[in-house]
Regions:
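Hydrophobic structural segments
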Residues: 1-108
Length: 108
């Protein structure tokens, strides 16, 4: 299965259109529709989570809380968000968040 296919399935179950206005659910980092080698589930994307995905050869992280809530103005090494984004891109890891859209669907 490819990244976009799993993202479509997740969006069918918990449509991004149902998220709160302040939220940022959906495919936050795309890995160019690569074939999925493994999926790592987490509550929050942290540097340890990205490192675990690399170690376990998972190239898709499914998180409840979005890593990116507001627009990034730069990607440096100064914040954990910037470091996670940079490392995920370097290792071809997609990150998908299902937050308030998942909270409001039945069985979500």
């Amino acid at each position: 299965m490819k990244t976009n296919e799993l993202a479509d399935i997740l969006n069918e179950f918990a449509p991004v259109s149902l998220q709160e206005k302040w939220d940022n659910a959906g495919l936050l980092i795309d890995n160019e529709n690569s074939y999925i080698t493994g999926v790592l589930l987490c509550l929050d994307v942290t540097e340890k989570v990205v490192d675990e995905a690399i170690q376990k050869k998972c190239n898709f992280i499914l998180a409840h809380h979005p890593l990116i809530f507001k627009g990034l103005t730069k990607i440096t090494q100064h914040t954990y968000t910037e470091r996670c984004v940079r490392k995920a891109i370097q290792h071809n890891i997609a990150i998908y968040a299902a937050h308030t859209n998942m909270d409001v669907v039945m069985n979500g």
